[in-house]
Amino acid sequence: MITKRIIPCLDVKEGRVVKGIQFLELKDAGDPVELAEVYDREGADELVFLDISASHEGRKTMVDVVEQVAAKLAIPFTVGGGINQLSDMKTILRAGADKVSVNTAAVLRPELITEGAEFFGSQCIVLAIDAKYDKESDTYKVYTHGGRKKTDWEVTAWAKEGVKRGAGEILLTSMDSDGEKKGFDHTLTKLVSEAVPVPVIASGGAGNAQHMLEAFTKGEADAALAASIFHYKETSIKEVKSYLKEYGVNVR
């Protein structure tokens, strides 16, 4: 039986962890290195860091953060945000990250996925997808530029394309559910989980342990990601894992 993973996410802006609702209204949530250590101790399976101030200045800060985190962590971690070329991947992986996550840059130039997978292996390449329900077409559309720009890609088509090019994992965020704490978008998660043969991480909407359970049972996700409920101590990784075990979910 496959072990399901619980992954805290740290959105990092100018060296601090922040959290918002539907990609807006950002609030400070602490120091990334301190939070990473706490989550490692609490039993997180992995961590995801997203540099949301992915300017040149943001990148320099992020490399420092990655190096500091790598020195303290025993669990794998993924870094994304502003990774536009192979050299960016090299910089982040050399700084100590285990995987890199690509989003906007991959939509603009899908070869980036291929280049990364060929150079580092698929296990290092995570395709992050921000998706939102589109009433007009009755499909989920892919968005770029931090959720600001709608693309023509339908979510499963883009996920399949990314996997074909070598992405080893999909980090799938529901923009409709992000920060709302009302549960993941199971329709979206299941759609993508069934469309691709690689692990799918459900993201956007975690408000409690039951939501995490449903990401696995209803959404068929391989991992569930959460931010604010852990940052603001509304629940702990330990509590989530013991709840999942009660319901027969295989966790570490």
Swiss-Prot record:
EC number of the protein: 4.3.2.10
Coiled coil spans: none
Cellular component, GO annotation: cytoplasm
A UniProt-annotated Pfam family: His_biosynth
CDD domains registered for this protein in UniProt: HisF
GO terms of biological process kind: L-histidine biosynthetic process
Enzyme class name: lyase
Reaction catalyzed: 5-[(5-phospho-1-deoxy-D-ribulos-1-ylimino)methylamino]-1-(5-phospho-beta-D-ribosyl)imidazole-4-carboxamide + L-glutamine = D-erythro-1-(imidazol-4-yl)glycerol 3-phosphate + 5-amino-1-(5-phospho-beta-D-ribosyl)imidazole-4-carboxamide + L-glutamate + H(+)
Protein location: Cytoplasm
Keywords: Amino-acid biosynthesis, Cytoplasm, Histidine biosynthesis, Lyase
Active site (UniProt): 11, 130
GO molecular function: imidazoleglycerol-phosphate synthase activity; lyase activity
Pathway assignment: Amino-acid biosynthesis; L-histidine biosynthesis; L-histidine from 5-phospho-alpha-D-ribose 1-diphosphate: step 5/9
Function comment: IGPS catalyzes the conversion of PRFAR and glutamine to IGP, AICAR and glutamate. The HisF subunit catalyzes the cyclization activity that produces IGP and AICAR from PRFAR using the ammonia provided by the HisH subunit.
Subunit (UniProt): Heterodimer of HisH and HisF.
PANTHER family: IMIDAZOLE GLYCEROL PHOSPHATE SYNTHASE HISHF (PTHR21235:SF2), IMIDAZOLE GLYCEROL PHOSPHATE SYNTHASE SUBUNIT HISF/H IGP SYNTHASE SUBUNIT HISF/H (PTHR21235)
Family: Belongs to the HisA/HisF family.
Name this protein carries in UniProt: Imidazole glycerol phosphate synthase subunit HisF
Organism: Bacillus subtilis (strain 168)
Phylogenetic classification of the source organism: Bacteria, Bacillati, Bacillota, Bacilli, Bacillales
Gene symbol of the encoding locus: hisF
